[in-house]
Amino acid sequence: FERKNYFYPDLPKGYQISQYAHPLVSNASFALSSGKHIRIRRIHLEEDTAALTHQQDSSLVDHNRAGAPLMELVTEPDFSSAAEVKEFASEFQTLLRYVGASRARLEQSELRFEANVSLNMGTKVELKNIGSLYALEQATLYEIERQKALLDKGEKVRHETRGWNEVLRETVLQRSKEEAHDYRYFPEPDLPPFAPPIIFDLEALAARLPELPWQKRARFIKEFQLDSEAARLITESPALADFFEQAASELAAWAK
């Protein structure tokens, strides 16, 4: 683990415990419904920050979640539309629920999104702490158009962090974005190095997985003659999918 050093109101002690040089997972991928694969750069553990609620002329700081552990997943810049971003986020939310890793309730901040948008490759704008799939899509769409307008006028896109304002329906500046060297990463002295004692057998782990959402979706389409949209809606929730399957089984038995 490393200390990530920066000063901001959501970080009361001035640094965040994170993983930088040695993430838990690297070089994975996730397939969209189109067959396109989104590369996953890394998955690492770090501690959460406080929650900021921005008002018209002030901001409120909620420290209830500060210091709680979280898992962060970082993708490669493989998305070409806001629709792909939303689909990936939705599918990942469903996957977390199916494997029992998290209830992933957006309204409880159990899952949050941060979208990096870059039309001029190399200069990205990070959209922080987006709390719904709809807001994720709308914020990404707005930021694409904002950057396009700047580039069309011959202006530069600044490397910065922005938030999504639901009332104004636009992204707003939060702070200038730091580079990795600005965080002055160094080993966390209060935590010993984390070295898993075993080599994971990926095939054995895969065999223990439950039926995954896209597998259940394909089976429902074939078994119950559902269209793809109905199958998607039913399988978004493991509980709803189980209820549907049990009801269909009981109805079939009653019909006999």
Place the predicted regions along the sequence by residue.
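Basic, nucleic-acid-interacting segments
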Residues: F1-P210, K222, S228, S249-W254
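Extended, structured, electrostatic nucleic-acid-contact surfaces
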Residues: W214-I221
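Histone-fold and other basic nucleic-acid-binding segments
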Residues: A218, S228-K256
